[in-house]
Amino acid sequence: MDSKYQCVKLNDGHFMPVLGFGTYAPAEVPKSKALEATKLAIEAGFRHIDSAHLYNNEEQVGLAIRSKIADGSVKREDIFYTSKLWCNSHRPELVRPALERSLKNLQLDYVDLYLIHFPVSVKPGEEVIPKDENGKILFDTVDLCATWEAVEKCKDAGLAKSIGVSNFNRRQLEMILNKPGLKYKPVCNQVECHPYFNQRKLLDFCKSKDIVLVAYSALGSHREEPWVDPNSPVLLEDPVLCALAKKHKRTPALIALRYQLQRGVVVLAKSYNEQRIRQNVQVFEFQLTSEEMKAIDGLNRNVRYLTLDIFAGPPNYPFSDEY
């Protein structure tokens, strides 16, 4: 297999490419950009494409995948596509219809991976963040173990090859793993992870349970207000990363991506810029020494860019625990 498509074996026997293309973009970015960027990513060598119902771009991303299949660039089985169940569909009876809606938007028969996007539940309906007349979020109370059972049924039905979670803390992972009658373990936990927030404890826990950690915001470049504090430090301007980039004749982004691969983390690189999309697949062309890895480990300062504190309050809010 070409180094560009290096994969990790998941606990269910399926394989996931270790470098993924993240398709999220702020609301003001035209959706047509998701179509163009996803096509460029596949042309550049990305085979793992990450999206979600929340991103409101699955129609465009699906079209990009299907157009690259139609022109002979790739086969469907070459592409590893991830979608995610949003918080307004946690009730067990809403899980399969939510996935079927994503598949209809994508015009695909199955997804390779379906994740519970975030562990806090909100009231069902069309609104992704439903609020009352005072602007308060309308939360829902759902047993995530029941949600997980409904996700397992999607795997049994062949609608998702693999299933996992995102933004879960250790306690929430243990709740699923210790569930009586568990049929399938989550294959992965997709979380924010980068040199300023390296998730060492959660990574060690996931490895001990044969769960892959997938890193989003791996470049810390998602600085969209009001989600991210504009005063938070800019990761890609870090002097250590910049010095290593200079030494290896690479970009600071590539250093941050390579760091994750060498510690056994699957990494998502999100960019709509053609040059950077092409650059990011160079992550397989060089290696960091153990000293360089240690230096990057030393940058950790527990800076979580995406606190999602609008969801704080309910007991399932994941980021109050240490990890």
Curated annotation (Swiss-Prot):
GO cellular component, one term: cytosol
InterPro entries: AKR, AKR1C, Aldo/ket_reductase_CS, NADP_OxRdtase_dom, NADP_OxRdtase_dom_sf
Substrates-to-products reaction catalysed: a 3alpha-hydroxysteroid + NADP(+) = a 3-oxosteroid + NADPH + H(+); a 3alpha-hydroxysteroid + NAD(+) = a 3-oxosteroid + NADH + H(+); (17R,20S)-17,20-dihydroxypregn-4-en-3-one + NADP(+) = 17alpha-hydroxyprogesterone + NADPH + H(+); (17R,20S)-17,20-dihydroxypregn-4-en-3-one + NAD(+) = 17alpha-hydroxyprogesterone + NADH + H(+)
Gene3D superfamilies named in the record: NADP-dependent oxidoreductase domain (3.20.20.100)
UniProt-annotated location(s): Cytoplasm, Cytosol
Notes on activation and inhibition: Inhibited by hexestrol with an IC(50) of 9.5 uM, 1,10-phenanthroline with an IC(50) of 55 uM, 1,7-phenanthroline with an IC(50) of 72 uM, flufenamic acid with an IC(50) of 6.0 uM, indomethacin with an IC(50) of 140 uM, ibuprofen with an IC(50) of 950 uM, lithocholic acid with an IC(50) of 25 uM, ursodeoxycholic acid with an IC(50) of 340 uM and chenodeoxycholic acid with an IC(50) of 570 uM. The oxidation reaction is inhibited by low micromolar concentrations of NADPH.
Site (Important for substrate specificity): L54
Entry protein name: Aldo-keto reductase family 1 member C1
Species this protein is from: Homo sapiens (Human)
Lineage, top ranks: Eukaryota, Metazoa, Chordata, Craniata, Vertebrata
Primary gene name: AKR1C1
